[in-house]
């Protein structure tokens, strides 16, 4: 699959997720097979561009793979300016957020709130596409609510404005993340558009990924919450989708080493206080797929020193690995 001049290595992408898809997490997902990863959402409000959070999100030069950056806002001129600034900092693809359902985003008329105003959508897309030389993509939902599913209308506007690829999450804004994603509307859009369509929503296994691609005939899929604590999912999906073969997840020992590396990179990227704080949620997600332990998690969450976090994790993982070895010996 191509987006603009970029040939992507596969059709399995990491979704932009605020507070999650920072550089360390994107690097790990790229290593484990994500064909394209997107940054956290960047506000187009110039008043926040100089905050520490925005500065970290603007550091595109250390990226692994293609630098795809998502921006969010509602003012066409501000959106265009934000796109230009991100390109100056190294962004190679600009993605426009018109899918976020969060109230704090929608109250500012950004994210999925824009789906209610097709004329404004057209103004924004035209401005951004004309302001940069890199490909511009768009992420939306199927509509504002069940009575206003207008993703086909928005998709046609996007294609007319020069959008290079369109991601559709299979829920309306009013659904938030409740219920199950539906793929009929994604399929309908794909049937009528010529630009690449990326399907998104509730894709948490290789089998589901293959089903969604086959059902919708989408050009690619985008994985969001399914990747939390599970970055190796991309490799498993790629093997089934691209090679029609099953590849095993990494060994427990490899997973433990990856987690330790991830936590160490978070400390280096964010600094002591914030790095330790962000590490806690990632550790919680990782442990869900390895060995949930509320007692250890509570103790880990109380640690405020980076070295002590790593020591605690190493000790916990050593116990898990020792138990596994004992179980193997007793069964053989």
Curated annotation (Swiss-Prot):
Entry EC no(s): 1.3.1.-
The entry's FMN-binding residues are 16-18, 70, 139, 200-202, 224-225
Q: Which organism is it from?
A: Pasteurella multocida (strain Pm70)
Active site (catalytic residues): 100 (proton donor)
What is the organism lineage in this UniProt record? Bacteria, Pseudomonadati, Pseudomonadota, Gammaproteobacteria, Pasteurellales
Q: Which cofactor does it need?
A: FMN
PROSITE patterns linked: UPF0034 (PS01136)
Q: Which reaction does it catalyse?
A: a 5,6-dihydrouridine in tRNA + NAD(+) = a uridine in tRNA + NADH + H(+); a 5,6-dihydrouridine in tRNA + NADP(+) = a uridine in tRNA + NADPH + H(+)
Q: What does the protein in this record do? A: Catalyzes the synthesis of 5,6-dihydrouridine (D), a modified base found in the D-loop of most tRNAs, via the reduction of the C5-C6 double bond in target uridines.
Establish whether keyword tRNA-binding is in the entry. yes
The protein in question is named tRNA-dihydrouridine synthase B
- SUPFAM superfamilies per the UniProt record, alphabetical: FMN-linked oxidoreductases
Keyword vocabulary terms for this entry: Flavoprotein, FMN, NADP, Oxidoreductase, RNA-binding, tRNA processing, tRNA-binding
Please provide, alphabetically and separated by semicolons, the GO molecular function terms listed in this UniProt record: flavin adenine dinucleotide binding; FMN binding; tRNA binding; tRNA dihydrouridine synthase activity
**Enzyme category, top tier:** oxidoreductase
Q: Which domain of life is it from?
A: Bacteria
Report the PANTHER family cross-referenced here.
Answer: TRNA-DIHYDROURIDINE(47) SYNTHASE [NAD(P)(+)]-LIKE
| InterPro entries linked | Aldolase_TIM (IPR013785), DUS-like_FMN-bd (IPR035587), DUS_fam (IPR001269), DusB (IPR032887), DusB-like (IPR004652), tRNA-dHydroUridine_Synthase_C (IPR024036), tRNA_hU_synthase_CS (IPR018517)
Q: Which NCBIfam families match?
A: nifR3_yhdG (TIGR00737)
